[in-house]
Amino acid sequence: MIDYTKNSVRFDGLQTLEEKIAVLRPPPWPRDLFGLDDSLAALGKPLFEAHCSGCHAVQASVDVPGAWRTPVLAVGTDPKMALNSARMSDAGLLTGALMPPPAIGARIGNPAKAGDMLANTVVGTLLAEAVVPPVPPPAKLAQSGVFRALRKDFANLPGENLDALLDPKLSATAKAEAMIKIRAFINAKLSNLFRPPPAIAGAAYESRVLNGIWATAPYLHNGSVPNLWELLKPTKDRRTSFMVGSRVFDPKNVGYDTDQSPFKNGRFVADPANANGNGNGGHEYGTALTDEQRWAIIEYLKTL
């Protein structure tokens, strides 16, 4: 039996970070510092809409669930991260641990899928924090990270309100009933962690919204492409080696200076064959455009 209450997770700090992240906005392009060619950006907008917006929509689609989910076989980028949850590993102390819903009753074997072990630990720790008695005093409960996180979710459910738990006159029975609801809610919310990990045919990456994309180099999920200019090239023409760690920004190519590094071993070597997790292949969209059209798209991306 694993005692999930014995953990070093700082829930209050984690929830504070989540609340800060929730109000972050993408940074605007520093026009005063680097300038912006508005005419070129205007030429880039229709090119972006024709060649990029199918995956990188500016707003989420309410009509097509999972519209930003791009299959690995379609985008052609390194599949290792997408398939990582299916990796088998020594389960160690988790061997024999019960699985939460929807796999309730099943136990973790040895070896086990890395995704199953991670999900089991996350769910067990959250449940232990949220529902293990005794319920703390109202003032302390209101400030707890788990309560603050759940409070927002419960507010969107008809007839549900966690604030009742803050009533010092609430009976022990009523508190227990509320905690049972919380446990069921967490189980339901986290059950999708236990979906079977995908084979290559079902693996996918999120094709993110590109607001503030200028500030997020290097590119692709593994940072294997140094700047936007390189990303719009065919794989065969991309740099396979560049320096990382520089804080000198390159406003022309939109990335960081890749010819210098503050680190002794600051050279990144990409794998065009996408075999070792550092692949820079794939995402060959817009690679048939002219250089002038690529520069126009890049100028438009600065405006997002």
Give residue ranges: language-model regions.
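Periplasmic c-type cytochrome electron-transfer domains
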Residues: 1-304
